[in-house]
Amino acid sequence: MTSQLLVILFTFFVQFTDKVGCERVCLSDVAMEMREQRGIAIDSLDYEVSPIYLDSVRAMGAKVLHTSRWINGATVTTGLQTIAQIEACDFVDTVYLTREEEGLLPLGKTSVSLRKRMVEENSLPSDPPPPASIEQLDQLNLLPLHQAGYRGKGIRIGVADGGFYNANTMSALPKAQWLGYADFTDDEDDFFGSSGNHGTLCVSAILASQSDYEGAAVEAEYFLFRTEEQYTESPKELDNWVAAIEMADSLGLHIVSTSLGYTTFDDEQFDFTYADMDGRLSRGAQAAAIAARKGMLLVVAAGNDGNKAWHYLSTPADADSILTVGAVDIDGEIAAFSSFGPSADGRVKPEVCAVGKQTSLLNPSDGWVMTGNGTSFACPLIAGAAACLWSALPTASNMEIRERIIRSADRYTTPHEQYGYGIPDLWEAYGKGTGNNLPYVDDYHAYEVEKIWYNGQLFIKKNNTLYNILGTNITIH
């Protein structure tokens, strides 16, 4: 019989005063090259957390789970007596309690599992037959970029989520483009096992390709981050996410898609208010803004609380300089559950929308096409679209890619509290400033170009110039 012990588990974020003894820059060669190409200087935020301080914290009996070089601190588990000793140290600025749990543990274990709600309560398969995945890409006018050869090649995408069931075995996901994975949670189950499939569904929207399904950026490379605890909802998960975003920066990823968000928690003492959604208060929002300064494009789901008491967006979706994504249906109508903006400080949120109601996805269990609901699934569509645009404009900065996407949206001049700037047009986003914003004929549709239309035959009523997808003048015979 296994012995058990009733314990109170505490997790804290310990923020340090400075970076004494820090000599190591936490950037890979790839990341360093990206910084040089974009003229982004190395600064103190790129240096490791003080190893001297970390050793001191460990020596007092705390377990260091992970660190944040941007916020300059560490996530630790320990008891109240030890944390009081740590807080009294001169090198400690502030200590934040991030999780307090009570449970029966097998002796020798250091984590507890308490059932919590689903990562995305609206992310459920639905009964009607799914639309062709091509339709949700077409809504973003992404197909012309695909036809021009821009499907995300050369772009590295991270997906931060809560579970990647079968992501390592799904035949529709390109294994040659998989860069790796990292787990920042306390969950002891297998990364690709029973931790849920929410992350895998999101990955499928970006990268899956088979005869009846096409993701948004099937030629991108990708890295998987598990940051969402399976059984609890606490501020510790935001610190997990911050650690993942910093790793993404270290690896030299271009984009991170995050279909997670935080408003209220299992323990009400940690709950945010709408006033907190100002892009500055949460460590997640702070880290997101830093990531943007470091050259990454973060794409974050707005949240599924539009028809609930909370109503507004979550964090880190409130961060500045990112793309927060709302959900619409295939006809462009807002989903009732899509969370409202603006941010508490008045910025337009969400920035853009994509299909998040009846989104076409691949089931990780059997590879069949299914549908799901949630801004969770609109988010990876925008992340994939951004990857295609960036592959077409490889010298562009993250902020230029973001700005092009926003300016191409159909409500850009009249933003809305739920649509934001609206649904982007990726072909237009590519064309702005490149000379390629031209009418075209593609393999998928018949388009009307002034007096030109297709109805069994092509008729031209007046002398117009027609261009193909690459912007080259073509002749109609």
What name fits each language-model region?
Residues 13-15, 66, 74-77, 96, ...:
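Structural recognition of the beta-strand scaffold that forms the well-ordered cores
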Residues 18-21, 71-72, 81-83, 101-103, ...:
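Solvent-exposed loop/turn segments at secondary-structure junctions
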Residues 94, 133, 143-182, 186-237, ...:
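Subtilisin-like serine protease catalytic core
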